[in-house]
Amino acid sequence: MSTSTDTLLFDTIFTTIGSTTKHFKCYNNYNGVLKISSLHLAMETNSPYRINVDGKSGVLFEEIELLPGDSMFIFVEVTIDPNGQNLPLVVEDKIIFNTNGNEHQVVLNAWGQDAYFHVNELVEGQWLNDKPHVIYGVAAVGFPNLDSGKTLSIDAGTTIHGHANSVLYVYKSSLEVNGTLNDPVVFQQDRMEDYLLYPADSVSGQWRGIYFFQPNQSSITHTEIKNAVVGIQIDTLHNNQFVVLNKVKINNSLYANL
């Protein structure tokens, strides 16, 4: 069994309660009949997502058969209230397929609150502090074979959240993080709700961190960076430019703070 995607991303930012629907396909690549004993949402009835299979909506479907070479559409709907203070920045669930003792998963991600979302994109200019910023994948200030010599300036009081495996990447460009004593800039994970056994803020390695490659002159001031894989990594090679750190606190990184 295979699916047309391993992650379904609902990248609509809601300003009022709303819903949207996306779909993917499930394929039977084998010569025999594929028997899906169950297809369900990991969060079950607690999920904001709903699945539609063959015109029926629900959170659990059982005993589905696909003929050899056949496929089926699976529609997924999510309803989000961005004003719900208990929602995480990124609302995640999974569709779990059980077939002949094997498990296959498709991850579901939707924006849970009103924020600036940077999804695998080139970034420059100014990041304001009026809403949180969420990095999903790579937010790149310059990128090999695409762009360089750019500048990203981050205002005092800005909060930046990194999704799992996400990175702020600075390639032959400048990063200016302008925190102050009373309004520091904070980089941290996007998961703010606690895990079952641990507070969310105690778990390291929840996002990749800030990575500089041959940076132009950059500065980071009055900033906290926490719970990354590596807080700040600087690959200068033959570049004589500097990254100036002033009143920067880096803690709880998985491998190294700096």
Located regions from the model:
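Beta-strand/loop edge motif enriched in small/polar residues
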Residues: S2-T12, I17-G18, H23, K56-L258
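Asparagine-centered strand-capping/turn motif at beta-strand->loop junctions
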Residues: C26-V33
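Residue-level signal for short segments within beta-strands and strand-turn junctions
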Residues: N28, H40-M43, T99, Q189
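Short flexible loop/turn segments that cap and initiate beta-strands
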Residues: K35-S38
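Short, solvent-exposed loop/linker segments at beta-strand-coil boundaries, enriched for Pro/Gly
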Residues: H40-L60
